[in-house]
Amino acid sequence: MVYESGFTTRRTYSSRPVTTSYAVTTPRLDLCTDRPGSHRSRASSDYSYTSKSSVEKSSYDSSNPHSYRPERSTYTSTVEKTSRSGPGGSYNYSTERTSTTGAGPGGYSYSSTTSGNLPGGTKYRHFSYHV
C-alpha cells in the first residue's frame, strides 16, 4: 500500500493604513502700491497640499510559525503651486515631491519634479530621483 501525502503552503497578506494626514493652504489676494495715489491689486495664489500615509503590511507562511515578517512603509506626497504677478510679468511654479520609506531594495526612494514659467516666457522643468 502506498500512501501519498501533500501539503499546501499558504501565504497570508494583511495591509491596513495607520496614519493619513492632509494639509491645504487656500489662495490669497494681496494689495500692493507701486506709487502714491495708485493702487493695484496683485493676485498671488499659493496652494500647498500634503498627503502622508503609513501602511503596515505583514506576511505569514502557515507552514512555518516563525515566518511572521511585519513590513512598514510610509508614503508622502507634497504638491506646491505658487503664482505671482509683477512688473516683469507673471511668475508661477509648481513643485511635486514624493518620498517612500520602506519600499524598494534600498528601503528609501525619493523623487522631485519642479516646473514653471519665468517672466519673459522662459519655461523650466527639473526632475530628480534618488533610491
Swiss-Prot record:
Domain of life assignment: Eukaryota
GO BP terms in the entry: response to anoxia
Q: What is noted besides the main data?
A: 'fau' is an acronym for 'fly, anoxia, up-regulated'.
Extract the ranges annotated as region (Disordered): 1-121
Arranged from A to Z, the UniProt key words for this protein are:
Stress response
| Bias (Low complexity) ranges | 44-53, 98-116
What this chain does, per the entry, is described as:
Plays an important role in the regulation of tissue responsiveness to oxygen deprivation.
Tissues of expression: Concentrated in lamina neurons, first optic lobe neurons and cortical neurons of central brain.
Q: What induces it?
A: By anoxia.
Q: Does the keyword Metal-binding apply?
A: no
Q: What is this protein called?
A: Protein anoxia up-regulated
The species this protein belongs to is Drosophila melanogaster
Which ranges are annotated Polar residues under compositional bias? Answer: 1-24
